[in-house]
């Protein structure tokens, strides 16, 4: 009986902690997919990835992930035709605009745009 009462008290304590937690602040997620002019060219891919890594110096970027298509199960809904992708997280749209206008981003575009034939961007506002 005591164990049950203790568990009940722990549950109540956990519920109180969950209720007291601050609300999650929405973020802006910026996901970019690049298709190279010369698909499969390792030097071009490496140069693009090196350029993307320079963007980490921009302070308003909360998180930056850089990657290539994953070796996952082939399914009709999976598009793995891109060569390189980057995913960034910002606190808000104002910070994303600061990033777009930042000299490091502008230098990246100038030094790497000759590498890609196509770029697709998905911007998302998180809900929770």
Task: Describe the role of every protein-language-model region.
Residues 2, 23, 50, 54-60, ...:
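An amphipathic, aromatic/His-enriched active-site/gating alpha helix that lines ligand/cofactor pockets
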Residues 18-20, 56-83, 121-126:
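Short, glycine- and small/hydrophobic-rich beta-strand elements in well-ordered beta-sheets
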Residues 1-18:
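N-terminal export signals
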Residues 27-36, 72-100:
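Short, well-ordered beta-strand segments in beta-rich or mixed alpha/beta enzyme
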Residues 43, 62, 71-74, 97, ...:
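A broad, structure-centric signal for solvent-exposed, well-ordered loop/edge residues
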Residues 17, 21, 32-33, 67, ...:
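Compositionally biased, intrinsically disordered low-complexity segments enriched
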Residues 20-55, 59-65:
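N-terminal secretory signal peptides
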